[in-house]
Amino acid sequence: VIGVVGVNVESVIFANNILWPDVPTNRELKKSDEEKYAIFLSDLHVGSSKFLPEDFDKFLKWINGDLGNEQQRSISKNVDYIFIAGDLVDGCGIYPEQDKELLTKDVYQQYRDCAKLLEQIPEHIPLIICPGNHDALRISEPQPQLSKDYAKPLHDMNNVVMVSNPSMVNINST
């Protein structure tokens, strides 16, 4: 995603400036001496009939160390970050006849239900949450972080960090 500042004359855009996302251009790979993990989730779609509650329940049991073999439980103990890259909820009115697929037709309730699920993740693990096209905000990028007006229960959680889309996040830094 880039931003272009310029003038549109007939069918030609004259660019005066290009705005690049906040992403570094160097490609230096940094590694930790410790075995640590980051989990990337997206498209939970809480509130939709397409949400997978049984699978998410298994994830919650695993991240809490209650599911999996010895190696899998060892990995769950070393999770330091969970990123959720958009579409926490299914939203309302996102596409025609969406209401036929919704189990929860109130977007505020969808966010409350989502928070109840995410509260089951150990509080020492930061949850970095980025919005998506089904979340309650504008679809076009860049998107601001999720609003307290809609997602207050998530904002109230001590381990939640709301970020914009796109955004740059520095983890495990000294």
List the model feature ranges, each with a label:
Residues 1-174:
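Extended recognition/assembly regions associated with phosphoester-bond processing machinery
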